[in-house]
């Protein structure tokens, strides 16, 4: 191989490595977002359950008052 071809190959390899590093960083960011969204989802589910219990209790009280 000529030096020119080796230089082009080296450039392409360097570009590929940089792209891989950027993709790894993006993947890590997305993983962190996913973890945050999972935590938020869990909190919202707990809030929903709490509200459902409160509403069920209030409906029960209303039913007792009606009867």
UniProtKB/Swiss-Prot annotation:
GO cellular component: cytoplasm
Compartments in which it is found: Cytoplasm
One GO BP: division septum assembly
Taxonomy, superkingdom: Bacteria
Main localisation: cytoplasm
Keyword Coiled coil: yes
Protein task: Non-essential, abundant cell division factor that is required for proper Z-ring formation. It is recruited early to the divisome by direct interaction with FtsZ, stimulating Z-ring assembly and thereby promoting cell division earlier in the cell cycle. Its recruitment to the Z-ring requires functional FtsA or ZipA.
Family under the similarity heading: Belongs to the ZapB family.
Complex formation: Homodimer. The ends of the coiled-coil dimer bind to each other, forming polymers. Interacts with FtsZ.
Protein name in UniProt: Cell division protein ZapB
Species the sequence originates in: Shewanella woodyi (strain ATCC 51908 / MS32)
Organism ancestry: Bacteria, Pseudomonadati, Pseudomonadota, Gammaproteobacteria, Alteromonadales
């Amino acid at each position: 191989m000529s030096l020119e071809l080796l230089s082009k190959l080296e450039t392409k390899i360097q570009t590929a490595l940089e792209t891989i590093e950027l993709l790894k960083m993006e993947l890590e960011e997305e993983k962190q977002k996913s973890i945050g969204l999972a935590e938020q989802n869990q909190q919202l589910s707990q809030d929903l359950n709490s509200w459902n219990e409160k509403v069920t209790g209030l409906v029960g009280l209303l039913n007792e008052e009606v009867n």
